[in-house]
Amino acid sequence: MALVKGVAQSQTRPLAFHGEQWTPRALFTVFGAFRASKDYAKLIEFLTNNFACYVKNKTFNFAGTGHLFHSLYAFVPNVSELVKERKQIRLQIDCVMRLFKNTTNDFKMYVELFAFIDAHGGAECPCLLLQQSKLNAVSFVENLNCKLFDIKPPKFKKEPFDSILSKYSLNYKALCFKKKEKCTVGCVTKRQKKMKRRQLLSDRVIYLHNKNDVLDERTLLHGPSGTSLAPCLHRYATVERQTRAGDEMVSFIRYCELCQMRA
């Protein structure tokens, strides 16, 4: 099979195409007919005979095919960068049947988007329209996050085909906001898990106020904590404290000037 300008060209093309090279639009018509007839065995035979170079061990690989087979599984770009484009499908009847069943609504959306392309032109594959709508939504959310208070908020740019996307519950703007909310919640959760590590072991001596005092070893507590304790040599003082504001009644408090312990 030869490649002409990035589009696959079969060596054994059906007569219906009269020698023309394969295009995403032509294959969309073929795949639509197979979906309608539910003849999955014929579809597998069609892919095997016409695109044998992409078949290996009963697996059809999409690597290097561009937009050619997007209508086979109705590719819809995802907001998350973690969800990648499909790379292959298993050429078995149950696998193809499951694929078609899971992408029924997406293929119906492709039908209307191809009709829009036929009427207005400008795109080779419906996924390019979906990608354009996705980029508009991402740009709108980013500009909204960076807007200043003295500037009017940006307006969301709607495309003529956005009504088709809304019909099939595909709203990239809402998905971008939902992704931003999940990211914010994840960041907050991660921030809450941060804990400051404190040094528990210490070689300090507590209540050692007079450096000239020599302490007996028997008065020191040597424990696994690594901290030594020495008794405080209390030096008491008495102060007057007013109990309430504006009240003449006072209390006499006796406390240690060294360790602040009350008598």
Swiss-Prot record:
GO annotation, biological process: regulation of DNA-templated transcription
Sorted UniProt keywords: Transcription, Transcription regulation
Transmembrane segments: none
Pfam family, one: Baculo_LEF5_C
Function of the molecule: Required for late and very late gene expression.
Name this polypeptide is given: Late expression factor 5
Family as reported in the entry's similarity comment: Belongs to the baculoviridae LEF-5 family.
Organism: Orgyia pseudotsugata multicapsid polyhedrosis virus (OpMNPV)
InterPro entries according to UniProt: Baculo_LEF5_C, Baculo_LEF5_N
